[in-house]
């Protein structure tokens, strides 16, 4: 593990209280500040620092508790100053309820993913599916999975998901799930520079990060960085490991984390959710598979 080139003083609990900070249940992961300029729960730049040294973005967990716990262990080593989630928290895995509860306990700020939206607002899937009627069998499978996830989550968790914002802005970083205009559509890694700039240039930050497509990349485009964080679960790039984005002193990278895929496959087999066999095939191969 490479050493951090700049280290900031992490305040003691007493110092933090005197400055108006609240310590999270996971002291590695969050410092919140309360003052007249922030809303409850906002995460801000550390007081006394001009910039965050390290920012991590963890996206597309998809209810995969085994992969998520492995990523948390890696985050304890990389020790970011701020962690954001990129949405798609619950649907598509063995543990939707446990993932939502864990994210809330950690206090991570994040953005609305398309599967979060379809769980909280079922009509959003109908609206999007109507644009691609040729994929009607796929949308039917996804709706059956979503119905089971909604039942597992319950109304209160669904309401929380539905209130997630569509974007987060922190220092030089803008985070969206797919694109600034939609959590459902975004360019692919092979998109042209012009295409990426057209979508992400309007965010007005030097670094734009998104999730959604489960294929990580980092591109330099028109004086800014556009990156995909990769996915904690259901990788589509042939690498079964979990992935997340790390910005270290403005140097972006993708972290890959080994986890016990077989353990998660067993959890899927026993969860009772519809089409768990489909999800298992994607997890086992690290590539998208048709239902």
Regions found by a protein language model. Name each.
Residues 4-5, 20, 24:
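Short, positively charged low-complexity motifs
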Residues 51, 130-139, 173-203:
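Active-site-proximal segments of metal-dependent phosphoesterases and phosphodiesterases across multiple
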Residues 54-62, 172-179, 226-230:
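Active-site-proximal beta-strand elements of phosphoester/diester hydrolases
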Residues 54-149:
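Core catalytic region of metal-dependent phosphoesterases/phosphodiesterases
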Residues 59-61, 87-89, 108, 114-117, ...:
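Active-site metal-binding loops of divalent metal-dependent hydrolases
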Residues 62-67, 91-94, 115-121, 181-183, ...:
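Active-site environment of divalent metal-dependent phosphoester hydrolases
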Residues 219-291:
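Acidic, His/Gly-rich catalytic cores of divalent-metal-dependent hydrolytic chemistry
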